[in-house]
Regions:
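Short, conserved glycine- and acidic-residue-centered signature motifs
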Residues: 32-36
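N-terminal intrinsically disordered, cationic/polar leader segments
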Residues: 1-31, 41, 45-112
Length: 112
């Protein structure tokens, strides 16, 4: 199962962590894992390349694991606001995946 955690502070998503594998299909053919991987990579790339936050962004990624902590990234209020567009888009997409494939994806949101 893929477990996704979002932390919110003052109505903003400041942290996300994605762990695990869906095991919905064979390696390389798992549409659930592919969907989650694609949208999370797109979001990280958007934060780093489109918003030019690559030098500030606190993140880590490896096989079956992505974490991004905006709260520890020393971003300006403007950078955090802009990042929310990408992160909220990812969140909406992942919620749709969870609705369709809830056996393989679990999302938790917590206010801090």
């Amino acid at each position: 199962m893929i477990k996704i955690k979002f932390l919110k502070k003052n109505e903003r998503i400041i942290y996300f962590e994605i762990t695990g594998h869906a095991n919905h299909g064979e390696y390389g053919e798992d549409i659930v894992c592919s969907a989650v991987s694609s949208v999370s990579q797109m979001t990280l790339n958007g934060l780093m390349e489109t918003l030019k936050l690559d030098d500030k962004l606190q993140y880590k990624e490896k096989e079956g694991y992505i974490v991004c902590d905006l709260d520890k990234s020393n971003l300006t209020d403007d950078e955090i606001e802009k990042s929310q567009i990408l992160i909220l888009s990812m969140y909406s997409y992942l919620k749709a995946v969870e609705e369709s494939y809830g056996k393989y994806v679990e999302i938790r949101v917590r206010e801090v």
